[in-house]
């Protein structure tokens, strides 16, 4: 069902996933695969069918670690260099280790990645160390494919509800969340045994100097609300001083990151 909140003020579930962009559906699917009998809810402030930073599609993945093209060690080194050494290498390495399995899983969902005449992933060279860029000919179907998987596994979806605070139990453990409807301002309390935050980054925390809302490369929903919720619930936040925002070039549509020029002699 697409909406569990008709005339409902409270709801109980096993796992609450806040955020229905890309990470949220993946987390919800993993939870359901782990325990098919679990009640898993995806809470989204827009609509899961077309929400998140990848809502309108993606022309490629810039950070794929595929055997034969790159190693986890190479990727970790590349990311460390790109960030001037300010990098927590453990999660970066873990991401690199799991990357290929996730790509194959997405491939099985019908998300098509560019392949060569031998049927291998056609990864492109952009970074200094290793080869990581994997084009996606039908990247506009990512959300459709993920939504099909959610429906197939009968996960519960609550659209148009924005989480505002995490709930904690007497022992300090997270016990659910409070959300407000973005259309009629009604409140919903969801009690959960486990809560997973998949709420995107904070690249739209402020406006560009021009004041133009879409003058950056960041999705408008990436407002940092997940960080705020975690902080208010007692979580320790790290690396917020490493703020990244990608300005756009006027009247230009396409990749415009400076590091693209590096392997070709630019600086």
Where are these regions (language model features)?
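Gly-rich Lys/Arg/Thr-decorated short loops/hinges at beta-loop-alpha junctions or inter-strand turns
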Residues: 57-59, 83-87, 121-130, 204-210
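Residues forming the flavin
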Residues: 1-77, 115, 135-267
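Rossmann-like flavin
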Residues: 82-122
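Short secondary-structure transition/capping motifs
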Residues: 50, 84, 88-95, 131, ...
């Amino acid at each position: 069902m697409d909406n569990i909140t008709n005339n409902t003020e409270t709801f109980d579930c096993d796992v609450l996933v806040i955020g229905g962009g890309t990470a949220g559906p993946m987390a919800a699917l993993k939870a359901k695969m782990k325990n098919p009998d679990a009640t898993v809810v995806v809470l989204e402030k827009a609509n899961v069918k077309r929400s998140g930073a990848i809502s309108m599609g993606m022309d490629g993945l810039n950070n794929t670690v595929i055997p034969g093209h790159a190693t986890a060690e190479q990727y970790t080194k590349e990311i460390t260099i790109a960030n001037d050494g300010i990098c927590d290498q453990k999660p970066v390495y873990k991401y690199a280790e799991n990357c290929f399995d996730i790509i194959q899983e997405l491939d099985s969902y019908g998300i098509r990645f560019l392949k060569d005449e031998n049927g291998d992933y056609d990864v492109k060279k952009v970074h200094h160390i290793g080869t990581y860029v994997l084009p996606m000919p039908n990247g506009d179907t990512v959300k459709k494919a993920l939504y099909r998987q959610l429906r197939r596994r009968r996960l519960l979806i609550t659209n148009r509800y924005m989480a505002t605070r995490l709930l904690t139990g007497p022992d300090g453990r997270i016990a659910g969340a409070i959300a407000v409807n973005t259309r009629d301002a009604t409140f919903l309390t969801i009690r959960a045994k486990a809560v997973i935050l998949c709420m995107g980054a904070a690249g739209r925390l402020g406006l560009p100097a021009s004041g133009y809302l879409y003058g950056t490369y960041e999705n408008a929903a990436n407002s940092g609300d997940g960080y705020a919720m975690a902080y208010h619930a007692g979580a320790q936040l790290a690396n917020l001083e490493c703020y990244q925002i990608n300005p756009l070039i006027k009247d230009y549509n396409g990749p415009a990151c400076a590091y693209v020029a590096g392997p070709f002699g630019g600086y």
